Amino acid sequence: MKGRYPIDRQFGIWAKFTPSLSRGFLRLAAFFLPLMPKGLSDRRVNVTRVTFEKGGKALLIAAADCAENAPCLVCFHGGGFVFDAARYHYENAKRYALMAGCKVLFVRYPLAPGNPWPAPNDACLAAYRHALSHARELGIDAEKVAVGGDSAGGFLAADVALRAPEAGLPPPCFAMLIYPVIGGEETPSMHRFTDTPMWNARLNAKMWEYYAAGNQVILPGSRDLRAFPASYVETAEFDCLHDEGARFAERLAAAG
């Protein structure tokens, strides 16, 4: 039942909001989200538009005083593979740039249901490839390029980390996975959190319907993880994704 979870008051109205995944709502979101303020009009940061192959677009976000040849985080936003980035995604990217002393390549990838698997994954791998091949132009250190993302973005970050060596690319130096989508198995948290606000198991099932579109998606948890980069994995308390993220972290630890 909604409201039975002791969610912190700092979440405000979002503690009571659950999005629709109807195609009509997705069309509205696709129109309005890009028009929303991004919180990047800040003299502390410089923002540059970047385009690359596979239909991808990105923003390079860096502190105004960021040195050249800086580390870089290639960042993939969440949104269930169907929603564009929200303001808090951009604000988090800005925080990473300001607080970690790195540049952030914030990627906007093609969205389902119009662009199901593997289109988002291919665009994200292309963004990572672009960061490496254009490192000097972007002012980043090609040996210090990490990947990261939240929710669906965490899935895409893990996918890039696994596919990069297969594509003849150096692996990321690090992976930051924030309450990542992993998939592949039924978990207690998926059965328990069917009515949580913002995201729940019912929405998650619909997400997979749109993203997979009848294809057999290659999941991060089904892969050999022995070459996976050093990682940070975060899970959320009242989250249907909790257990799959925790189990993926356990598998990473076991793989060394």
Regions found by a protein language model. Name each.
Residues 12, 21, 48-49, 53-256:
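Alpha/beta-hydrolase superfamily serine-hydrolase fold, recognizing
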Residues 1-65:
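A glycine/proline-hinged amphipathic helix-loop "lid/cap" segment
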